[in-house]
Every structure is written in C-alpha cells, then in structure tokens.
C-alpha cells in the first residue's frame, strides 16, 4: 500500500526515522512541505514518491496506542518509560539552543537567530512560519491521549488489605470454642420454649441459645424433698444467672462472657425476665415439670426396688454361708471323732481288718 495514493506531497517517513536523521538533511517532507521550498518560492509540483523500503523496515514506528487497552498500563516501570520518551519527543520538537545552526533534528541552516540566540523558523531553507508550533502540536496530539490513559502512577487506586482487629479475633475464637459450626438460621417454628422473649431480647441468636440451655439444665433438677441423690435447686435462680452472667461452669462460657460484657448484661437480665414469666404463666411449663417429676419418682422407685432386691440377696447369701459353715464344722467334728477311734484300736486289729478288706 503506497501512501502516494492518498497524499499529494511526498510520503511522510516514520517518527523514529526523521527524529534520527542527520542534521544536514531537512525533514520537512514529513509534514507535507516540499524540500528546498522557501516562503517566497512557489510550491513545487508533487514529486514522485520515494521507493519504499523492506516489508519490516519501519515496524517499530507503528502507532499502536489506539489498540492498547488502558487497563494494561498498570506497571510503574512502563509508565515511567512512556513519560521519559514523551519528554525526549518534546525536547526534540522544541526549538534548538543557541548557535544558529545547532545540531538538533528541527534546526535549519541559515535560519535567522531570534532574541536570546534561538533560531527562528522561516529562513532560506526552513519551513514557513508556524512550523515549530505545528510540530509541537502534532507531537502532543499524537502522544497526549496515550499518557492521559496511562495516568500518573501515584494517582492509581491501591488495594489495601485490611487486617482483622484483635477484638474480632477474640470473638471468633470464643464462638468457635462454643459452637463448632453455628450458622445463624431463623428460629424454628416448633420451638420447645412456650413464650419466647420479646423482639428486642430475642434478636441475638446466641443469647437465646444460652438462656434456653440454662433453663433446660435447671428444669431437669426437681425440687421435691425426696431421698438424697439430686440437690434441690434454689427458689430464685434468675438473680444467680444475672450475677454469673452466663449459665454453666464451663471455661468457654466464662471466656465468652468476659469477651462480651454487653452480651453478659443483656443476656442475663433478658433470660431472667423470660424465665420468671414462664414459671408464673405457662401451662406447658407446668405439664413438663409434672412429667419430669413423675419420671424422677419412677426412677427413684426403681432404685429403691433394686436396693431392696440387693439386700434380700445379701441376706440369702449370708444365711447360706452360715449354713455351710455349720456343715463344715459338723464334718470337722465327725472327722476328729473317727480319727480318735482309729487311734484307740490296736495295730493287730487294724491288720486283720485290712486283710479282711483285701
């Protein structure tokens, strides 16, 4: 594809080729100006295009900024590299230093020196006025969108990992020690508790479970004055529950109460109030208490019956032992008598008796 089909002037060489061209060769053809033309000379007819080079000769001069995703420029080294190349392009595009024939790529021999020794465009062999502005604008227009997409490395959003606080870790450890896996599901419909606590007290699921566990352990202990094995519970268990903070002597519950003072205060008071209301106004609690009492009485009756049976067996075995001892004593006496009789008999009679037996 030849560029002469689209431009009336000579084809524009790549940016890298005209930036690295020797000082004596003017590069105004890159912007469409014919070579050797001055402001007073008429424009020359379009010259024949220069022969193109190899296929991959100017491969590095292709502008691929429009095809590169801006999200790919996330490396600070790449951004610094583009920033450095941009500064070099701007420095080359600017007017060269003092000297009138400088050595820069955009210096033109024979151009008049302006104030401060700067070479002014529009000399005998230079481009028309405004060339420096056009070149600077061209380079800025070609390079600015790329750096606008890249952005400053210091302004990029940084993803900062937040470390958990010590309080959160302590809470998680305490909960993990209590319940190995305790998801927060909604309360089941068929709950054994007849009257759940109010809405402001039933919000924390853990408080509800702790109160229910404490109530269950207290319900399993009857308060009737029956023989020794089970202790009688206190008539007012709610104040003890509030003072202790959490029911149960376990170290995990104590650690949880120490880690959550607000939970300890609210849970103790709420559970005590709920239990008082249940003890006074719940028929289901009374029925359950009666069933527990009946079961305890049955178990105690069975224990008493086993004790009586054991005592009877002990008495029977004792009597048998006495009878056997008496039998042993009787047989011992008979043996001693027989031994005495045999000792009193003479030896001759014994020999005769043995001969008769033989």
UniProtKB/Swiss-Prot annotation:
Region of interest called Disordered, as start-end residue ranges on this chain: 1-55, 178-201, 217-291
Residue stretches spanning the membrane: none
Sequence ranges assigned to domain bZIP in this UniProt record: 282-345
Stretches the record annotates as Required to repress E2F1:TFDP1-mediated transcription, to inhibit cell cycle and to induce adipocyte differentiation: 1-70
Region (Interaction with FOXO1): 244-358
GO MF entries: chromatin DNA binding; DNA binding; DNA-binding transcription activator activity, RNA polymerase II-specific; DNA-binding transcription factor activity; DNA-binding transcription factor activity, RNA polymerase II-specific; histone deacetylase binding; HMG box domain binding; identical protein binding
Disulfide bonds: none
Phosphoserine found at: 190, 234
Record note on what altering residue 62 to A does: Decreased interaction with TRIB1
Superkingdom, natural source: Eukaryota
Region span, Leucine-zipper: 317-345
Modification N6-acetyllysine occurs at: 161
Function: Transcription factor that coordinates proliferation arrest and the differentiation of myeloid progenitors, adipocytes, hepatocytes, and cells of the lung and the placenta. Binds directly to the consensus DNA sequence 5'-T[TG]NNGNAA[TG]-3' acting as an activator on distinct target genes. During early embryogenesis, plays essential and redundant functions with CEBPB. Essential for the transition from common myeloid progenitors (CMP) to granulocyte/monocyte progenitors (GMP). Critical for the proper development of the liver and the lung.
Known disease link: Leukemia, acute myelogenous: A subtype of acute leukemia, a cancer of the white blood cells. AML is a malignant disease of bone marrow characterized by maturational arrest of hematopoietic precursors at an early stage of development. Clonal expansion of myeloid blasts occurs in bone marrow, blood, and other tissue. Myelogenous leukemias develop from changes in cells that normally produce neutrophils, basophils, eosinophils and monocytes.
Stated family: Belongs to the bZIP family. C/EBP subfamily.
Subunit annotation: Binds DNA as a homodimer and as a heterodimer. Can form stable heterodimers with CEBPB, CEBPD, CEBPE and CEBPG. Interacts with PRDM16. Interacts with UBN1. Interacts with ZNF638; this interaction increases transcriptional activation. Interacts with the complex TFDP2:E2F1; the interaction prevents CEBPA binding to target gene promoters and represses its transcriptional activity. Interacts with RB1. Interacts (when phosphorylated at Ser-190) with CDK2, CDK4, E2F4 and SMARCA2. Interacts with SREBPF1. (Microbial infection) Interacts with HBV protein X.
UniProt name for this protein: CCAAT/enhancer-binding protein alpha
This protein's encoding gene: CEBPA
């Amino acid at each position: 594809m030849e560029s002469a089909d689209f431009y009336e002037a000579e084809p524009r060489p790549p940016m890298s080729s005209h930036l690295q061209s020797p000082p004596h060769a003017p590069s105004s053809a890159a912007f469409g100006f014919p070579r050797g033309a001055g402001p007073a000379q008429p424009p020359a007819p379009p010259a024949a295009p220069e022969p193109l080079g190899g296929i991959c000769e100017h491969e590095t001069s292709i502008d691929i900024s429009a095809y590169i995703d801006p999200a790919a420029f996330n490396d600070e080294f790449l951004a610094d590299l583009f920033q450095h190349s941009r500064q070099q392009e701007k420095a080359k595009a600017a007017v060269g230093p003092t000297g009138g024939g400088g050595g820069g790529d955009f210096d033109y021999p024979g151009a008049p020196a302006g104030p401060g020794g700067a070479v002014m465009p529009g000399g005998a062999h230079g481009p028309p006025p405004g060339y420096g502005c056009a070149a600077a604008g061209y380079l800025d227009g070609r390079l600015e969108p790329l750096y606008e997409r890249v952005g400053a490395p210091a302004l990029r959003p940084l993803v900062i990992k937040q470390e958990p606080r010590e309080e959160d870790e302590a809470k998680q450890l305490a909960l993990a020690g209590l319940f190995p896996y305790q998801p927060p599901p909604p309360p089941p419909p068929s709950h054994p508790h007849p009257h759940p606590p109010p809405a402001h007290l039933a919000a924390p699921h853990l408080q509800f479970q702790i109160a229910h566990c404490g109530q269950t352990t207290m319900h399993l202990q009857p308060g009737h004055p029956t023989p020794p094995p089970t202790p009688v519970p206190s008539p007012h268990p709610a104040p003890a529950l509030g003072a202790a903070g959490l029911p149960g002597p376990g170290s995990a519950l104590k650690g949880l109460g120490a880690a959550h003072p607000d939970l300890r205060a609210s849970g103790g008071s709420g559970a005590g109030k709920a239990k008082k209301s249940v003890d006074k106004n719940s028929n289901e609690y009374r029925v359950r208490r009666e069933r527990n009492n009946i079961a305890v009485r049955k178990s105690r009756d069975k224990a008493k019956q086993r004790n009586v049976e054991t005592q009877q067996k002990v008495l029977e075995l004792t009597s048998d032992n006495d009878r056997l001892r008496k039998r042993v004593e009787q047989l011992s006496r008979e043996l001693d008598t027989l031994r005495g009789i045999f000792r009193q008999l003479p030896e001759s009679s014994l020999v005769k008796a043995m001969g008769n037996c033989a």
